[in-house]
Amino acid sequence: MKRIILITAGLIMATTGFAQSSYFVPKEIQAAYDNGTRSHKGVPGENYWQNTVKYNLKAELNPQTKMLNGSGTMVYTNNSPDSLRFLIIKLLPNVHKKGGARDYAFGEEHLNDGMIIDSIAISDVAEDIGNRRKFREFGTNLYVIFSRANKLAPGADIDIFLQWHYQVVDHGLRNGAYTDSAFFIGYWYPQIAVYDDVFGWDREDYTGKQETYNKSEMGGFNRAVVEWWFAR
């Protein structure tokens, strides 16, 4: 009996030692290895891809009213092998929106109505931002939903024109008015979220403490900021 117990204990220890020599790999990472988009060496795989977006933006900040108005076009290219049913646009100033979820308790002077989309056009066709079948806003994420027949195919691109505004709060999170003439404007434009080969869309709501994954997809920027006192 003692010999049987010793043999069993030895087998358990051997099995445990073998198990400890391998590491847990999340299923999403393993799928990326299998698809060839990532490699065990930490470098991109032979099938790696990144979606891209090009921004052409213009903004004007009125220091007296603390109102920022912006407009611009985003050209988004789907380099993934997936047909996209929707896009996500990050409205990061919504972290200060009244009634929104956030990691800090703010006074009224630190709250606003969020980033308000005044108009939107997709592929030169004006759309109603209030159409819930096409647009849905959750926290800092704005979903732009395509019909099943008009999904964004692999290799296709889409242009989105936006006009927006928001009230700059006092001493906000990476975004605020500090004096009558000193402003920190960190998240001033709508940004298309990252869609990657591991998790798909970055759907995480920005609540204040964390840095956001999307610093915009790979692409380019053409931007102009109008100085209000010269534009009067």
Spans of features found by a protein language model:
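Bacterial Sec-dependent N-terminal signal peptides
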Residues: M1-F24
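A surface-exposed beta-strand-loop module
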Residues: M67, T77, A105-A182, K215, ...
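Residues that flank catalytic or metal-binding motifs in active/ligand-binding sites
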Residues: V53, R85, D113-I116, T140, ...
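Ligand-binding face of N-terminal immunoglobulin V-set domains in extracellular IgSF glycoproteins
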Residues: K66-R102, F106
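Beta-strand elements of well-folded, non-transmembrane domains
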Residues: A59-P63, M74-S80, L91-V95, W164-V168, ...
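Intrinsic-disorder/low-complexity, polar/charged segments enriched in Ser/Thr/Lys/Arg/Asp/Glu/Gln
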Residues: K54-N56, M67-T73, F86, D157-F161, ...
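N-terminal, polar/Ser/Thr-rich
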Residues: A19-N69, Y213-M218, V225-W229
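Extended, low-hydrophobicity, Ser/Thr/Pro/Gly-biased non-transmembrane segments
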Residues: E46, N112-D113, I160-R232
